């Protein structure tokens, strides 16, 4: 179980963006974070994935803190994939960061072999996001955090990416926490909704 208990987080000396936030996510559960824009959904996603340390509270998996070294069992798929990859690294190498390249994973996401030798700026946002999803899943996470991962993509690419991710998290019994401003997407995917 992924648990956040009493999370408080502030940027600098400002007012807390998160204050006393708690939630629990079981394996196989699909939780939507819901709140108006600017109220801490992305911040909470980053705290859950271990990218930000809370000012107060803690994040645990099965009662233990997230590991500080090695591959984290919580993987995040960012809204802007170009910010999640090294712009000077070819994408095949980026994908291999998570371990051996799983051909079924690559094929299922529609990643073409010729894209492996390209740099991030040479692909569209949808193509690049496919690499980010493949890298997150290749790490064999127990939980995936998806922060508006399809917002900037066309409707067809959104549908393909979400269908693939849903099949994978179900097959692997991975817990999913996602942020989306689409009520239709939330209704279709979420097993639970957490209001911040």
Protein language model regions, located:
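Conserved ABC ATPase signature
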Residues: 119-123, 127
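Hydrophobic anchor residue at the start of the ABC signature
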Residues: 133, 145, 161
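ABC ATPase NBD coupling module
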Residues: 63-75, 83, 89, 93
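Helix-to-loop junction immediately C-terminal to a conserved catalytic motif
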Residues: 49
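Conserved catalytic motifs of ABC-family nucleotide-binding domains
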Residues: 140
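Q-loop/switch helix immediately C-terminal to the Walker
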Residues: 80, 87-102
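A short, flexible loop at the N-terminus of ABC-type nucleotide-binding domains that lies
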Residues: 1-4, 8-20, 27
């Amino acid at each position: 179980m992924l648990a956040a208990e009493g999370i408080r987080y502030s940027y600098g000396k400002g007012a807390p963006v998160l204050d006393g936030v708690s939630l629990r996510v079981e394996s196989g559960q699909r939780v939507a974070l819901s709140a108006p824009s600017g109220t801490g959904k992305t911040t909470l996603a980053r705290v859950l994935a271990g990218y930000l340390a809370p000012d107060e509270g803690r994040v645990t998996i099965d009662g233990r803190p997230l590991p500080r070294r090695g591959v984290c069992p919580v993987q995040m798929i960012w809204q802007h994939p170009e910010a999640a990859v090294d712009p000077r690294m070819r994408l095949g190498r980026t994908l291999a960061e998570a371990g051996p390249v799983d051909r079924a994973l690559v094929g299922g996401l529609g990643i073409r072999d010729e894209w492996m030798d390209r740099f991030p700026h040479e692909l569209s946002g949808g193509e690049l996001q496919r690499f980010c999803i493949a890298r997150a899943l290749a790490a064999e996470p127990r939980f995936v955090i998806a922060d508006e991962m399809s917002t900037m993509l066309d409707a067809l690419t959104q549908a393909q990416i979400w269908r693939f991710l849903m099949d994978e998290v179900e097959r692997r019994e991975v817990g999913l926490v996602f942020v989306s401003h689409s009520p239709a997407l939330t209704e279709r995917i979420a097993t639970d909704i957490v209001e911040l």
